[in-house]
């Protein structure tokens, strides 16, 4: 039985990694070992940051809602609590959008939240 060497698979794997490393600076786009390390690191960063993105946006929305709520005489927690008590179930993304783009509508929500005590 003939000895099988993995040249075809190895070449394909190397090409795949080097293709992913296209655009990297210097040896990281030319040499397989360095390209492989750089690609693995970048994929790891991408994986982690897809999760961090969700946390970051939630923090941004909360900061915007808090700022708008304080303009209307409420804290963030009292505003959210008042909305829940009055049965208004808007998510933080929508509330933050209202706070930025439609201050009048947000002010009405704030009044509703104040009245729900």
From Swiss-Prot:
Q: What does this protein do?
A: Binds directly to 23S ribosomal RNA and is necessary for the in vitro assembly process of the 50S ribosomal subunit. It is not involved in the protein synthesizing functions of that subunit.
Q: Identify the InterPro entries for this entry.
A: Ribosomal_bL20 (IPR005813), RIBOSOMAL_L20_CS (IPR049946), Ribosomal_protein_bL20_C (IPR035566)
Keyword annotations for this protein?
Ribonucleoprotein, Ribosomal protein, RNA-binding, rRNA-binding
Example GO BP: translation
Question: Which taxonomic lineage is given here?
Answer: Bacteria, Bacillati, Bacillota, Clostridia, Eubacteriales
Q: Which family does it belong to?
A: Belongs to the bacterial ribosomal protein bL20 family.
Q: What is this protein called?
A: Large ribosomal subunit protein bL20
Gene Ontology MF terms in the entry: rRNA binding; structural constituent of ribosome
Q: NCBIfam families, alphabetically?
A: rplT_bact
Q: Which SUPFAM superfamilies match?
A: Ribosomal protein L20 (SSF74731)
Q: Which cellular component, as a GO term, is one annotated location?
A: ribosome
């Amino acid at each position: 039985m003939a000895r099988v060497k993995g040249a075809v698979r190895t070449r394909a794997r190397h090409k795949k990694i080097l293709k992913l490393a296209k655009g990297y600076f210097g040896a990281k786009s030319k040499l397989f070992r360095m390209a492989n390390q750089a690609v693995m690191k970048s994929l790891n960063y991408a994986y982690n940051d897809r999760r961090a993105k969700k946390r970051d946006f939630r923090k941004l929305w909360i900061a915007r809602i808090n700022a708008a709520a304080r303009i209307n005489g409420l804290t963030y927690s009292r505003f959210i609590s008042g909305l829940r008590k009055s049965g208004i179930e808007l998510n933080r993304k929508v509330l933050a959008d209202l706070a930025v783009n439609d201050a009048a509508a947000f002010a009405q929500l704030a009044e509703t939240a104040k009245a729900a005590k």
